């Protein structure tokens, strides 16, 4: 009988679908990167998805985030994504946590018995905290570095944090991890594209010079085709890692 995962089953078989159905994956940050990662998980048949994000959809999200439409501005991102996934796979258990991952909330995050974590969050100090906790708990993690201020989606690659370069966020993360005694062992996706410089005349219009948060003062540029690709790559990587023990036959070169 045909079902929404029939095309997936052609490659990974019933045992592959069952493996994904029995997996729990967390997506931390459901924005331009995380919303596409979550959708990739849902359309692959992952059976339990934890969505973590405190934000509501903002008008500036509409250019790139999967759940962001003019009609959804002001609504919680996790709730919108949960409803979207329910229309893809009603059997998928979606846990929507409208909160930020912090030192006060992280224990609640890890209470769900996670098989994998996708980190698409923005705050570097909490990214570091998450990395340390995942290493301590032996939970596989892939963390997104910078997807803003980029225009070439073909420049993404997955590597150990120790092998990253060019990406300013990756540089900060490397430095902070070294101070914690961690030099390698954290899997990330980063771009080797040099970031663009935002237009100052536009920044004056959309930024807030009185804001305490740098991102509000200096909002980064973004588009539909870079963060989405990062999210899809992360989602695909997690799915295939969960399926690492499933035999997938390939055409042999002659």
UniProtKB/Swiss-Prot annotation:
GO molecular function, one term: ubiquitin-like modifier activating enzyme activity
Keyword ATP-binding: yes
Annotated SUPFAM superfamilies: Activating enzymes of the ubiquitin-like proteins
Entry's EC annotation: 6.1.-.-
Pfam families associated with the record: ThiF (PF00899)
Disulphide bridges, residue numbers: none
Transmembrane residue ranges: none
Keywords attached to this entry: ATP-binding, Ligase, Nucleotide-binding
Annotated Gene3D superfamilies: NAD(P)-binding Rossmann-like Domain
GO terms of biological process kind: cyclic threonylcarbamoyladenosine biosynthetic process
InterPro entries xrefs: ThiF/MoeB/HesA (IPR045886), ThiF_NAD_FAD-bd (IPR000594), Ubiquitin-activating_enz (IPR035985)
PANTHER family on file: TRNA THREONYLCARBAMOYLADENOSINE DEHYDRATASE (PTHR43267:SF1)
Function: Catalyzes the ATP-dependent dehydration of threonylcarbamoyladenosine at position 37 (t(6)A37) to form cyclic t(6)A37 (ct(6)A37) in tRNAs that read codons beginning with adenine.
Family: Belongs to the HesA/MoeB/ThiF family.
Name assigned to this protein: tRNA threonylcarbamoyladenosine dehydratase
Organism: Bacillus subtilis (strain 168)
Phylogenetic lineage: Bacteria, Bacillati, Bacillota, Bacilli, Bacillales
Gene name as annotated: tcdA
């Amino acid at each position: 009988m045909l079902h929404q995962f029939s095309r997936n089953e052609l490659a990974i078989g019933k045992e592959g679908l069952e493996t994904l159905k029995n997996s729990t994956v967390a997506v931390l940050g459901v924005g331009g990167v995380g919303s596409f990662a979550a959708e990739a998980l849902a359309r692959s048949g992952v059976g339990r998805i934890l969505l973590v994000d405190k934000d509501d959809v903002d008008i500036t999200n509409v250019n790139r985030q999967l759940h962001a439409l003019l009609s959804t501005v002001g609504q919680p991102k996790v709730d919108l994504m949960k409803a979207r996934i329910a229309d893809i796979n009603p059997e998928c258990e979606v846990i929507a946590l409208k909160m930020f991952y912090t030192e006060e909330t992280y224990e609640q995050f890890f209470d769900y018995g996670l098989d994998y974590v996708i980190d698409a969050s923005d705050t570097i100090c909490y990214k570091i905290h998450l990395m340390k906790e995942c290493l301590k708990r032996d939970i596989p993690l892939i963390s997104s570095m910078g997807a803003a201020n980029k225009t070439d989606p073909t420049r993404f690659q997955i590597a150990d944090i120790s092998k990253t370069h060019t990406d300013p966020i990756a540089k900060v993360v490397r430095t902070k991890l070294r101070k914690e005694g961690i030099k390698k062992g954290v899997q990330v996706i980063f771009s080797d594209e040099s970031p663009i410089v935002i237009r100052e005349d536009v920044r004056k219009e959309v930024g807030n010079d009185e804001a305490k948060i740098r991102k509000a003062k200096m909002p980064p540029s973004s588009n539909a085709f870079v963060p989405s690709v990062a999210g899809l790559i992360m989602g695909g990587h997690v799915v295939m890692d969960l399926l690492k023990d499933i035999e997938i036959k390939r055409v042999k070169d002659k």
